[in-house]
């Protein structure tokens, strides 16, 4: 994999706690990404940071490194109780909270700091058992955090570090009141280290930073470039009748190693899953209706390569670290132009190249002008031959069938149907 996304700045160049540096290097992290190189000098000096960087540029490791260093370098608040964590990391989704926790585990093992995880959906008693033994760093979603706080299972009066990840998504999902509720139960902003990281820093996010942080420094990486230069973008104009057949034909032509297909509704995602599973693809479905344990299992299978294709709503578009995604298909153009950037940001990460293919159908083509205005360029248009689209397609599976979330392993080679233009 290309290392061109890294800077010459090494973690060992900073005055980081030796245990943190050792843990990073053990995991193969030696050089900083641009956002890490900008953030660490500030957080090591005790400055608050509001950071913007494109997805996949290392935001998570930037705030984890800062958090572990700060806790190791500063004593806990006097008379701290067992139910009082020292650091709180808030994430908008369960999947992102789980991912952050997984990324933090090597640092926790190396430093002896204890991690806790709190998210809704399931695992209430299991999560609570960990919290009752005492944790240093608590990672979670706002709803479950508030639930535990109201029952006094956790107390935020000894918080020394706060991280808000994907703050713009917090607004999108309506969590801003929850965030403010949690902040009101912490020590004042000038008595803690505050970090906010997001792929976009809108006016409302900056307002939140002004309100809840202590004179935060704003840092940005590639702020003018909305879409990664390593991502090849492509646009088709199918009719509604030809849209599904075009998608399946493109998949057969591209034969992606690992692809994510985004649609705007759970019903549309289920429909796409049914067609692809029936056609023999190893495909998983990720929507809000999928049970939490199954969602985590599907993400794990996709990451391991047991699934080739993931069909998802935008719940999977923000913050998740899924390596080596080669293709992103926008089956529906998103209603929010920022979601276009976050979707295609699933590919072309960490120095790799990627391919984004969007279908501007009759229903969602009206979203295209706003998207192109936002990203600052027109998406190159490709044509296709309607007569060359796949026709010998099996009847789609229904979601209630036992093979939900997984199809048989693909065999053979792609069918020889080439597009025109």
From Swiss-Prot:
Single GO molecular function: RNA binding
Disordered: annotated segments: 392-421
Domain Helicase ATP-binding: 40-219
Recorded catalytic activity of this chain's protein: ATP + H2O = ADP + phosphate + H(+)
Subcellular localization: Cytoplasm
Gene Ontology CC annotations of this record: cytosol
Keyword Repressor among record annotations: no
Q motif, short sequence motif: residues: 9-37
Entries under InterPro entries matching the protein: DEAD/DEAH_box_helicase_dom, DEAD_box_RNA_helicase, Helicase_ATP-bd, Helicase_C-like, P-loop_NTPase, RNA-helicase_DEAD-box_CS, RNA_helicase_ATP-dep_RhlB, RNA_helicase_DEAD_Q_motif
Protein's UniProt name: ATP-dependent RNA helicase RhlB
Gene: rhlB
